[in-house]
Amino acid sequence: MFEDFINALQNFKQNKTRTFLSLLGVIIGVASVILITTLGQSATENVKKSFGSSGLDIIKISSGFMNRRSASRIQFNESFRTELWENIENIKKIHLINNLSATLVYGDLSVNGSGVAIEHDYLQMYNFELEYGNFFSVTDNISGSQKIILGSEVAQALFPEGNALGKKIILISSNIRFGFEVVGVLKEQSGGMENPSTSVYIPRGFYSKKIQPNPIASSIVCQVTDQKLSTKVAENIK
């Protein structure tokens, strides 16, 4: 063994350049692996940050989401929701939503916004937070309450001095006027799959009773049990 050690030292002396280059190659290789791993982790965190607090566990289903053959025969209604519950695993929540163009009016001020008719706890599913006020209750949706939650930019446009809570505003859609009470204002969101800043939200129960009876949903939003399963669940739905 001692002779082997002596031979190794002699080889090192005779091949210093080769040994140095070999060590340099190993060092560069290890450093590259560390750098790539670090960049990969950083990219993953950046993606998560860009989606905001809403996470990556949300699947939004619209006609364009479905394959062409399925889309021609599917209606986004209660029957389709039941079909999803019964046939697709790893779904935690299913929400039917309807979109509407809306003009909001308070006194002499008005602003255009994206109206969304939602079901109970839809906003909580996205982890949206309130600047003040309350979210819709189950009763609000069932009874079709004339309540409205404003995105931060809409609230600022209509109530530049703040204090929108409890105020009565007018929502105009398809040239029809509806009165709503402001029950909440959302905090400004830094990012995410859905940015509510320029949106307003009303109970879908009101939409289905007063605006469009027995409506087919504009889209369906599903929350999966684990964000790692999102791709698999989406493929199963298609």
Name each model feature, range by range.
Residues 29-40:
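Alpha-helical transmembrane segments
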Residues 40-114, 121-124, 156-157, 208-209, ...:
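Hydrophobic, regular-secondary-structure patches
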Residues 99-104, 135-138, 169-171:
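Short, solvent-exposed loop/turn elements at beta->coil junctions and helix N-caps
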Residues 19-23, 35, 166:
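Signature of the 12-TM Major Facilitator Superfamily
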Residues 121-135, 146-238:
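Mid-to-C-terminal secondary-structure elements
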Residues 8-11, 26, 46, 50, ...:
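Amphipathic alpha-helical segments that mediate coupling or scaffolding at interfaces
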